[in-house]
């Protein structure tokens, strides 16, 4: 499980870049130009396409918003109180297996990749929220264990 010490600006930036790439892949996979017409012969396929497109893009929007909140926190634009109060990552349902079955393997893999990405962020968020805000940072705790005084 992620600990508070594992969240830092570099990790958030890396995850943010990954989220942007994944979001762009989702956008291209679910671009509806021509896909709805092709699927219109089967209503169930059209419903599955619409539902999973909405679910997957919303999952990625929530992920990007969570990452933007953490970027703002590390840039000093949000306080820890604001981040804890308003920056929680929402729970999000996974794709329904029967709907996933109508997609080609590449689209299914993309949907599952967004689910895994969201689950990673959720673990990081939960680990960060479990930390006591008054507890010393990992560096301060290490210094204390080593008996080194902080420079100041």
State where each predicted segment sits:
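Surface-exposed peri-terminal alpha-helical interaction modules
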Residues: 1-152
């Amino acid at each position: 499980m992620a600990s508070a010490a594992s969240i830092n600006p570099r990790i958030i930036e890396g995850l943010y870049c990954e989220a942007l790439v994944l979001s762009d892949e989702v956008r291209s996979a679910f671009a509806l130009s021509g896909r709805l017409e092709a699927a219109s012969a089967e209503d169930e396929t059209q419903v599955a396409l619409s539902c999973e497109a909405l679910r997957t893009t919303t999952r990625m929007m929530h992920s990007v918003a969570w990452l933007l909140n953490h970027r703002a926190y590390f840039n000093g634009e949000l306080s820890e109180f604001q981040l804890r109060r308003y920056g929680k990552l929402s729970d999000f349902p996974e794709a329904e297996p029967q709907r996933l079955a109508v997609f080609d393997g590449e689209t299914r893999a993309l949907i599952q990749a967004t689910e895994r990405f969201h689950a990673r962020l959720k673990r990081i968020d939960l680990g960060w929220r479990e930390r006591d805000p008054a507890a010393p940072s990992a560096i301060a705790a290490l210094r204390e264990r080593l008996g080194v005084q902080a420079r100041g």
